[in-house]
């Protein structure tokens, strides 16, 4: 599917943030590991979370899926599947599932998309080797063998992906000797690790960590207990609607964004405020009023998913917008630093790619044109927002990739006044 976005000078109305992808993934995993019935109210159904749901089913849980409620029936015991677990393009699914399948003590096969297999896996391989678990990679297939791991002390890099840390933490409490996880480099996206720890706590499993989050300890013998989750809105997805309001100087209300969310990308509200937008909270509703924007320096080490949409904001801000701490964006669904640079430049942006970030000179008068999503959901959504202030229509190729994280994205854009044409 391709989508043409018609420029829109003013938005209005309200929408609801899609449910949190990060929380949905983690609640599914914790439900699998619990003995009993775990309920997810308002879960996110998208390509990635559906991949995790399929993995949970493959490992022995029974899922009942309704429109706004998922129910997980599990014994808390993992069974080795007869067929490969398909992780699709979901990095979270793959990185959470590998440590879990090692607990079965059986040879278990997984498979993933070609693009996912280009993303780093080595830190997890090296960590599991210390637990006498081997990962063999053959093309798009992954074989895990050598378990079950007994636990103990394990070292891992913290600056490649927080998902490796979260995956090991989920599995750690089920190891005979518990788990001590030592990070050899500082953790990035710390709030996602904190979110994992909070979901585990809600299921009765406690993780101890030091202040700088370089050492984690899980005592053995802890049991996951079933619970009920109400999944709140996703800041990383809502960022696109909020940015659309900011660049069009519009007033928009976004529901279901609690101010105390543990997700790293909630910092986006602070960034918007620093750039000049007016932000107000009323309970769990964010009210944004777009105003003249100014460029700022933003380090996104703990919130890398914001990189593409921050580059778009930079195109509409006065002065320089410098985005740093973004080296990990090269290993996402696409090389996001290269992708957003090439596509924004194609429609007139003054943007420079750097080794670990981007420099945008604004305001950049964007023009009509055709751009490529690189089959990357966050690139597609960022380009759709960029098109709102362009001098003419912008066509986005392969825009269906938004279903990876935000299936209703274009519908939600239309709900606040944007005209889109699918073709």
Residue ranges of each PLM-predicted region?
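Short, structured segments at the rim of ligand-binding sites
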Residues: 1-423
């Amino acid at each position: 599917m391709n989508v043409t976005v018609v420029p829109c000078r003013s938005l209005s109305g309200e929408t609801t943030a899609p449910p949190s992808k990060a929380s949905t993934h983690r609640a599914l995993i914790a439900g699998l590991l619990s003995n009993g019935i775990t309920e997810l109210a308002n879960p996110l159904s998208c390509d990635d979370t559906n991949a995790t749901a399929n993995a949970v089913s493959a490992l022995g849980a029974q899922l009942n899926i309704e429109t706004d409620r998922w129910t997980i029936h599990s014994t808390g015991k993992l069974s080795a599947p007869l067929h490969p677990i398909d992780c699709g393009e979901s990095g979270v699914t793959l990185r959470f599932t590998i440590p879990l399948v090692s607990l079965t003590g059986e040879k278990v096969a997984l498979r993933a998309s070609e693009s996912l297999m280009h993303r780093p896996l080595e830190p997890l391989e090296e960590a599991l080797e210390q637990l006498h678990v081997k990962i063999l990679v053959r093309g798009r297939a992954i074989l895990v063998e050598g378990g079950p791991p007994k636990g103990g002390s394990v070292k891992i890099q913290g600056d490649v992906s927080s998902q490796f840390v979260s995956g090991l933490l989920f599995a750690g409490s089920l190891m005979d000797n518990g788990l001590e996880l030592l990070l050899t480099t500082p953790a990035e996206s710390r709030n996602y690790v904190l979110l994992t720890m909070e979901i585990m706590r809600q299921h009765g499993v406690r993780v101890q960590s030091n202040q700088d989050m370089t050492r984690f300890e899980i005592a053995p013998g802890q049991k996951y207990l079933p619970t009920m989750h109400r999944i709140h809105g996703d800041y990383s997805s809502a960022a696109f609607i909020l940015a659309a309001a900011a660049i069009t100087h519009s007033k928009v209300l976004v529901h279901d964004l609690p101010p105390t969310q543990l997700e790293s990308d909630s910092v986006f509200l602070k960034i918007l405020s620093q750039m000049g937008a007016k932000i107000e909270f009323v309970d769990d509703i964010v009210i944004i009023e777009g105003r003249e924007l100014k460029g700022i320096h933003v380090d996104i080490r703990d919130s890398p998913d914001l990189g593409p949409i921050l580059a778009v904001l930079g195109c509409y801000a006065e002065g320089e917008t410098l985005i740093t701490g973004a080296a990990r964006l090269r290993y996402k669904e696409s090389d996001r630093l290269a992708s957003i640079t090439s596509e924004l430049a194609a429609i007139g942006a003054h943007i420079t790619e750097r080794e670990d970030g981007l420099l945008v000179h604004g305001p950049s008068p964007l023009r009509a044109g055709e751009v490529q999503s690189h089959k990357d959901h966050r690139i597609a959504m960022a380009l759709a927002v960029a098109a709102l202030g362009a001098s003419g229509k912008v066509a986005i190729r392969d825009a269906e990739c938004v279903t990876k994280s935000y299936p209703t994205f274009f519908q939600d854009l239309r709900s606040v006044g944007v005209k889109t044409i699918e073709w």
